[in-house]
Each structure stands twice: as structure tokens, then as C-alpha cells.
Amino acid sequence: MSLFHLYTRVLQLLGKEARLGWILAVANLLLATAQFAEPILFGRIVDVMSGNLATGALVPETRSPWPLLGAWVGFGLFTIMCSALVALQADRLAHRRRQAVLTSYFEHILQLPISFHTGTHSGRLMKVMLQGTDALWRMWLGFFREHFAAILSLVVLLPLSLYINWRLAILLFVLCIVFTVLTTLVVHKTYGMQGEVEAQYSDLSARASDALGNVALVQSFVRVDAEVQGLRNVSGRLLEAQMPVLSWWALVTVITRASTTITVLSIFALGIYLNQQGLTSVGEIVMFVSFATLLIQRLEQVVNFINNVLMEAPRLREFIAVLDTVPAVRDRADAIDCGRLSGLVEFQNVSFSYDGKRPAIEDLSFTALPGDTIALVGATGAGKSTAIALLHRAFDPQSGVIKVDGMDIRGITLASLRRNIGVVFQEALLFDRSIADNLRVGKPDATPEELRLAAERAQALEFIERSDHKFDTNAGERGRMLSGGERQRLSIARALLKDPPILILDEATSALDAVTEAKLNLALDEVMKGRTTFVIAHRLSTIRDATRILVFDNGKVIESGTFDELVARGGAFAQLARAQFMVQESARSAMSSAADAQL
């Protein structure tokens, strides 16, 4: 994306308030153009006071400086008041749009598929969101206040100076040419460098976020010094990339300041000569010195504008790239709200591949009636989790159809489909908020009584009541203030509170002790009645009473039946059951031997 197209996209993000933005920009243009009247009045006053009335001064002739001075004061006060009003409105608009775009970005990334978040560091997404919206704010504010006015005021100033005195105007044109050539050279030199700088910033953010997210690992393996040194190394590479960019722009500042001084001195020198020849007045010399000062201000604004666009471009490109990411799964234009489902689920010849080559699911077909419990069994990577991900449309299959209550799930809105599905993940996911807030994720309007009932059914009420703040206890970042079993019980309570017709349990009792697991299984048996439940199981003891067990291998269902039927067949499931039984027996024997030895 070129700088021009990038800047155009920045202005498009003004959205519904773009019209107000253009009004502010045009107002600033008019105010910037009006500033040219001040040097003209100044020069005219000097001419009047010196008794040398010049022609073509754009001001009616007068022999008294007071009317001109009064006009200057009135005009100056008016422009100051208008400038303050426009600046205030510009600030408010830029702040409003920054918050609006930040919220839109946040909403957008939350809707992107899990596959996107799996491959993108959360620290990078936060950095892109904050730096991107800050860059947008600066660009908008610059557009409202300076960019548009600075560029177009040059178009007014140069012809005006030609009209007043073309000989002195030549010096202003030379100054413009020097600025243009120098700026073009520096932009060409630093364009790629700034992209490298932003890449190093991203690495710095990602590395710091990675270490902070794994503090326990860093401390337990005594990696503090190593991680700090790693951050120093990234910081060093960042400085190495940044210094050449700063040096080039420092050179621009030095040369432009020198050009400014030379131009002013040249105006005086040429002006004195022309005055001696009767080709200009003292007032015009003063006027052109003021013109030169204004021109320098405008040129510096243009240079700063180009510099800012160049500096912000990598951040803006990252931000817009994320904003333009299209979710692989989204609602169709004709998608409907399915309401509350009964729980009938059908997979019909479903196939799916992550990379388009090796199938993760191949020709999967089965039907789950309302109230059925379907267990999915198999080795890691066999396709169990992928099948469930397809059910709640984390992905769409390349072929085949998945139906709920006879409706293709692709014809149902994502929100209504997912409202009907409750999920208990193997790793409990909790917000850094109170226990009550975490439970209300399942039902935002849940009453305190409903919270207590759900917690009680999930065997969580006891530890909640033991805490000092009860349901107001903060769970900590990712639930770190709670034990693994406590987090999992809250996750189960949240799913029960949602009361969905379809329930997914991804080894939901894996983090619980044997006593709590036994209690929880009784509660789950009661809750699962009348619901279609899918259980991703690794411990076969948890699926003893499943309506049907699907045994996965390399994306295919190789066996299907009840627990007893599959064991009787002596196939893959029976081998897995025997292996787990032998492991459990070995563990029991080892524990018994240890106990006997102590006796």
C-alpha cells in the first residue's frame, strides 16, 4: 500500500464524521490563507511610515498608519478566536474517532477465528491496537490542523509573492526547491528503514509479553537474567535500526535551518539592491521577510507531515491489515436466528483439512438425538477436537453438511448457534474479574440465587463460600488466584448457568480430585438429561454410560458403539480400555507396595 493510499484510508476511517473533518480542514485552510494578510499590512504600514507608497500592495492607499494598524489588530483577534474554535473542535473529533475505531478494532479481533489468534501473539494485537489508534489520532489531528492547510497555502503564497514582486519571489521558489529535493532524498533513504524499526518494536513487545505471561516458568528455571538479556538484545537491534533514521532527519533540520537563514539574508541583500534601483520599497522587503518566515513554517509543516506519515506508516499498515482481515467463518446475508434448539445434531459426509492437503476429518457421518451423549475417543491429533470445532463453526467443512434440528448450521447466525452450545474446555478460561462476573458470562442477567444453584451443582459453592468475598472474589489473571480444580468447577458452573440444549465437555473433570470428580459426575449426569452432550474423553472411565462412542483415528471414525459393544469387539477401543485398566492397576499395585513397605 503506497503512502498516498495509506493516507486516503486513514481519512476514510473518519467514517460518518468525515464531513465534519473536511469542514475543519477547509476552515483551517481559510485561516492559513488569511494569515498572509498580516505581512501585507505590516509592509504597508512600514511604507506609510517611511513615506514610500508602493503600488500593487493589495491595500487601499492611506497616509495614516492607524487605520492599517487597527485593521491588523481586528483581523488578528478574529483569526485567533476562529483558530482556537477550530482547534478545539478538531481535538474533540480526533479523540471521538480514536475511541470509536479502537472499539471497532477490538470487536473485530474478538470475532476473528481461533486459527487467527493461534498464529498471532496477543501482545502483538494489543500493541497494534494501541499504537495504531494513536497513530490515527495524530494523523487526523494533523489533517484537521496542518496538512491540508500547509500544502494548499503554498499554492496561494507563491503566486501572491509573484504578483507583488517577482524578483524577490524567485528566492522563495529556490527555497521551496531545496526543501522538496532534500525531503524527497530523505524519504527515499528512510522509507525501508522505518519499516525495520517497527518490526523491531513488534519483536520487543512480543518478547516482553511472552516472558510476563510465563513468569512462573522464568522464575522456576532461573531464567530472569537470560530473559532480561534477551530483551536487551532486541532493544539493541531496535536502536541500531532507529539511529540512521534519526540521523537523516536531523540532517534535514540542519540544512533547512541553514537554507532559511540564507534565504532571509538574500532577501535583504536583493531587496536593498532593488530599492536602490527604485524597483521595490522598504515595506515590500519587510513583507517578503515575513513571507519567507511563513513559507518556512509551511514547508516545515509539510516536511513534518511527510515525516509523520513515513514514521506512522508501518503502524498504520499493521493496524489496517488486522482490520481488513476477513473471518473465514461469518454470517451469510440470509442467515436466520434459530431460536432455542432441541439438540438434534447430524454430520453428513463431513470432511475438513487445515492445510488443504492432509485431512483432519474425512467423510464423518453420525446422528445425535436430543438427550444423547456422544463420546469422542482417540489419540491426540485423531480429529476429535476438530469435529467439535466444526460443530460450533470455528471452521467450515470443505465438503459435507452439519445440521442442527434439520438446519444447515451455515444458514444460522453464529450468535444464535453458539447461544445453543455450552462448552467446558479442558483448560478452564477465566477473566481477571470476580467469580460472579465469570459465571455471568454464561447468563449475563443471572440472579444471585441462580449463581448459587449453578455453583452448588458444579461442586463449587463450598470453596466460594470459604473465600472472604464470596462471589465477589477476584479470580485473577486467567484465574491464577484459584486452583486448577476450582477453575474447572467454575467453568462447569458457567456452562450449567447457560443452560444450553447442546453441551460440549472437553475432558471437563480432568483437573479434579477423585472425590470431587465423583460428586461432579453425579451432577453432570443429572444436568445432561435432555441435552445433547459431546464428551471428548481421554479417560475411558468418564464415558462408561455414553449413548454412543466414536473412536477416531487419522480423521476417520474406525469404530462406533456403546462401551460394552466396543469392548466385546476386541478392536482398537478394547485395546485402549485394557491399556488404561492395566495402567490403573499398576498404579494401584505400586501404591499398595509403598504402603506395605512403610508398615
UniProtKB/Swiss-Prot annotation:
Subunit structure, as described in the record: Homodimer.
Main localization (coarse): membrane
Name of this chain's protein: Beta-(1-->2)glucan export ATP-binding/permease protein NdvA
Location of the protein in the cell: Cell inner membrane
Swiss-Prot/TrEMBL domain comment: In NdvA the ATP-binding domain (NBD) and the transmembrane domain (TMD) are fused.
Stretches assigned to the ABC transmembrane type-1 domain: 21-311
SMART domains found in the cross-reference section: AAA (SM00382)
Domain (ABC transporter): residue spans on this chain: 345-579
One Gene Ontology cellular component annotation held by this UniProt entry: plasma membrane
Similarity comment: family membership: Belongs to the ABC transporter superfamily. Beta-(1-->2)glucan exporter (TC 3.A.1.108.1) family.
Catalytic reaction list: [(1->2)-beta-D-glucosyl](n)(in) + ATP + H2O = [(1->2)-beta-D-glucosyl](n)(out) + ADP + phosphate + H(+)
GO MF annotation list: ABC-type beta-glucan transporter activity; ABC-type oligopeptide transporter activity; ATP binding; ATP hydrolysis activity
